[in-house]
């Protein structure tokens, strides 16, 4: 039975013939392939110092808790004072409205900033907006504890904080909101933060120290001396009088 099946299969295979209708199809396919142009692969430029993958986890902090070593002691420091006439951080950049501190520079803790942010989100719940933070906590505060004698080191880590200069923007907001609603949200947030704050809009004049650059006032005008100088005639007469005076005997 097996021999008969193999012989029948062999005879069927030998009876196969190539059809003549395949010749024009093959010619047409060859002509089409000759017309088509091969698509060259697009070269991908990869920098030599960039890894295509990473086996390490991403270590990134937030605006309230940075990815810094807590065991490394930090100096207390002082907030930035723009003595050279800088207006950096005093105007609204990304949003339409902002919250600006106007009384005195100070250090604000991360807990206070988080409370102010939660207050704004609670007031604007259900609205379409975007909140921008213009400050970030990057200063570690170390406390040695109550009733501790002087010395024995700086102390252990307590919390994160940020140094805020006078007239610096802390929060900005942009969205489909009424101005009065945003004013109310910033008013509630200002009550949660230390100091006095004001509501500013995009396009308001910048501030140098505690002086607003408005009504044609410029930084060059602030650099001029406030004390009025003596007239040239008065200075020349004073010099001539001192030169002609007789020396004391």
UniProtKB/Swiss-Prot annotation:
Location in the cell: Mitochondrion
First-listed, main subcellular location of the protein, grouped into a coarse class: mitochondrion
Top-level taxon in the UniProt lineage: Eukaryota
Protein keywords: Mitochondrion, Ribonucleoprotein, Ribosomal protein
PROSITE patterns with a match to the protein in the record: RIBOSOMAL_L16_2
Disulphide linkage map: none
SUPFAM superfamilies membership: Ribosomal protein L16p/L10e (SSF54686)
Keyword Ribosomal protein among record annotations: yes
A single cellular component GO annotation: mitochondrial large ribosomal subunit
MF terms in GO: rRNA binding; structural constituent of ribosome
GO biological process: mitochondrial translation
Pfam families registered for this protein in UniProt: Ribosomal_L16
Stored CDD domains: Ribosomal_L16_L10e
The keyword Manganese appears for this protein: no
Subunit structure and binding partners: Component of the mitochondrial large ribosomal subunit (mt-LSU). Mature N.crassa 74S mitochondrial ribosomes consist of a small (37S) and a large (54S) subunit. The 37S small subunit contains a 16S ribosomal RNA (16S mt-rRNA) and 32 different proteins. The 54S large subunit contains a 23S rRNA (23S mt-rRNA) and 42 different proteins.
Family membership noted in the UniProt record: Belongs to the universal ribosomal protein uL16 family.
Its job: Component of the mitochondrial ribosome (mitoribosome), a dedicated translation machinery responsible for the synthesis of mitochondrial genome-encoded proteins, including at least some of the essential transmembrane subunits of the mitochondrial respiratory chain. The mitoribosomes are attached to the mitochondrial inner membrane and translation products are cotranslationally integrated into the membrane.
Protein known as: Large ribosomal subunit protein uL16m
């Amino acid at each position: 039975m097996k021999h008969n099946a193999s012989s029948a299969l062999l005879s069927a295979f030998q009876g196969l013939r190539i059809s003549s209708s395949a010749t024009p199809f093959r010619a047409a396919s060859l002509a089409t392939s000759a017309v088509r142009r091969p698509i060259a692969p697009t070269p991908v430029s990869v920098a030599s110092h960039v890894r295509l993958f990473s086996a390490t986890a991403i270590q990134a902090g937030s605006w309230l808790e940075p990815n810094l070593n807590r065991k490394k002691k930090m100096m207390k420091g002082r907030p930035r004072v723009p003595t050279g006439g800088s207006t950096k951080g005093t105007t609204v950049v990304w949003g339409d409205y902002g919250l600006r501190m106007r009384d005195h520079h100070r250090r604000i803790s991360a807990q206070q900033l988080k409370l102010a942010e939660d207050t704004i989100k609670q007031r604007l719940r259900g609205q379409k907006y975007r909140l921008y933070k213009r400050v970030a906590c990057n200063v570690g505060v170390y406390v040695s504890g109550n009733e501790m004698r002087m010395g024995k080191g700086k102390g252990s880590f307590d919390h994160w904080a940020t140094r805020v200069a006078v007239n610096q923007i802390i929060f900005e907001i942009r969205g489909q909101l009424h101005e009065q609603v945003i004013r109310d949200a910033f008013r509630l947030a200002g009550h949660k933060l230390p100091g006095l704050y004001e509501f500013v809009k995009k396009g308001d004049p910048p501030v140098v120290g505690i002086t607003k650059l408005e009504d044609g006032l410029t930084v060059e005008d602030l650099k001029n001396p406030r004390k009025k100088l003596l007239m040239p005639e008065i200075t020349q007469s004073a010099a001539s009088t001192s030169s002609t005076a007789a020396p004391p005997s």
